[in-house]
From Swiss-Prot:
Protein name: Alkanesulfonate monooxygenase
Protein purpose: Catalyzes the desulfonation of aliphatic sulfonates.
Family membership: Belongs to the SsuD family.
Keywords: Flavoprotein, FMN, Monooxygenase, Oxidoreductase
Keyword GTP-binding assigned: no
EC id: 1.14.14.5
Catalytic activity annotation: an alkanesulfonate + FMNH2 + O2 = an aldehyde + FMN + sulfite + H2O + 2 H(+)
Name of the gene: ssuD
Enzyme class, spelled out: oxidoreductase
Disulfide bonds: none
Amino acid sequence: MEILWFIPTHGDARYLGSESDGRTADHLYFKQVAQAADRLGYTGVLLPTGRSCEDPWLTASALAGETKDLKFLVAVRPGLMQPSLAARMTSTLDRISDGRLLINVVAGGDPYELAGDGLFISHDERYEATDEFLTVWRRLLQGETVSYEGKHIKVENSNLLFPPQQEPHPPIYFGGSSQAGIEAAAKHTDVYLTWGEPPEQVKEKIERVKKQAAKEGRSVRFGIRLHVIARETEQEAWEAAERLISHLDDDTIAKAQAALSRYDSSGQQRMAVLHQGDRTKLEISPNLWAGIGLVRGGAGTALVGDPQTIADRIAEYQALGIESFIFSGYPHLEEAYYFAELVFPLLPFENDRTRKLQNKRGEAVGNTYFVKEKNA
């Protein structure tokens, strides 16, 4: 089992849709979140990509030197990056981070943003380009000299002089809910990622991916992307969820949904169907809440509850075959602590850092003793 957190390079806040409660999203804050995740024992962090985010490669490069064990899940963008350049970037960051790089393959889902970036190909063509990109990229990182000509990519005698630290290359994470996305992922990914859908939908998707991977003579692992709101009691958790969207008005939700409706991403369309823009029907499965998706693209659902309930819901996803969990919460610094301190002890997730986390003492009582020592 691995658990990753999230670096909010697109901004952070205590409330969605509120300017007054926003938090300055700069390198100092990113460093605070990354170092907290490193100290608490998270496996790694996801860095988002797109025009609303700081560049993930530069951000990860800056944070690698500020952390010790934390891994960085960073996006390659087929169609926007050439595979030879991406291979050099991958190899360099993997070496300077001492083998702590993970690769997130993002084909893109917003035609308007992609047009602004100079990419004018259809949804299915993006996955064709992704397949070609990863074919070349993987071969380069494995030390081959590559000549390749496809529909979207052509290289001649391309090679990589400095290999990555991880062999044969940093692990690949890849999500795509359409048939074209699943076919590309099945050929290349190490970990197939799904958005936080209800368990029955996740089960169906896992079966589709397994069958497609088997056709390629491969097996893949599975991961899920979710938000989380963990509190000591169910009531506190649901109150926190309601507070998070308490500043959202109907006009803001309508504008956000209109913007998200232009996406041609099957995954985004599946997220939108879960809540249909209706803030009165947000618990779409036990303890799975779609409130964040009212105004946020991509990951739009959260696990909400007390520690044991959240651990039980995670176990349900594990039983389906999910091994990698990528979480986030608003604001990201505080929620990293809430989740780690409350839920980690209930999960089959342990490393040297989580063991230190559990070997904790509170403030000295009466300048005389620590509570843990008294109760020992």
